[in-house]
Amino acid sequence: MTAITVTYKSDVKMNTDYYFGSHVPMVEDRLSSHGLRSAEVRKIVGTPTGAPAPYQIITTLYFDNVTDFTAAMGSDDGRAVLKDIANFYDGTPDIMIGET
């Protein structure tokens, strides 16, 4: 299983209402036909030490393998998902690929 982790930094302006109300449903709708198995979204509320958290949202997308993820993001649907980021986030999220 391939886990794609997308992090949104705390110090970058983000419209979380749009993210949860529009972007997350769009990702699930558009990428499920391209191999998206599931998605987890975590709103970060703090750290164990009380220090400010470096991220406000961490999202993990699960695909069977990295080939499916690459194909999904290269599709028209994947490009639409990436383009939509500008509608709610003033920066570029960090995207990491992991294996479970």
Named regions from a protein language model:
Residues 1-100:
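Macromolecular interaction modules
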